[in-house]
Amino acid sequence: MSASGGKIDHLGIAVRSIDQALEFYRDQLGLAVSLRETVDVEKVHAAMLPVGESRIELLEAAQPDSVIAKFIDKRGEGLHHVALTVPDLNAAVERLKAAGARLLNEPRAGAGGHLYVFIHPASTGGVLMELIQE
């Protein structure tokens, strides 16, 4: 997988309440919310806050059986994933599969309608990674 053209798109942070988290990120750090939406396929509410050329994504469980609810129950609030952009998501997925990487989903539309895939932490040295089509 080539990093050429890619960048760190966002850091996903699991929170119990986006509204409470915004008291810090917006009110204390001065970051503005550029997008707020519910991502039904992941059962989460999301808020994007630009930071330079990247973003912070605050993630709140929309349902008790969501991945974010389970993450918070097990680990508490905090860093959930690192998201990178790639110029060709399908080619990246094929390279990852050929190398034996464990993917958590096939490419699908998520926040902002962008195609994405998650890579299991067992394949990345312990970090949940998300790849997003540029």
Predicted features by range, described:
Residues 3, 7-9, 31-44, 63-80, ...:
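A cross-kingdom feature marking solvent-exposed beta-strand/loop segments within repeated
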Residues 13-15, 44, 68, 86-89, ...:
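Hydrophobic aliphatic residue packing
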Residues 16, 50-52:
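Short strand-coil-strand connectors
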Residues 1-22, 77-86, 134:
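N-terminal beta-strand motif that seeds the catalytic metal site of vicinal oxygen chelate
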Residues 2-4, 47-48, 57, 84, ...:
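Vicinal oxygen chelate
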Residues 21-26, 49, 96:
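Conserved active-site tyrosine of GNAT-family acetyltransferases
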Residues 21, 29-32, 55-56, 64-67, ...:
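Short loop/beta submotifs within extracellular cysteine-rich repeat domains
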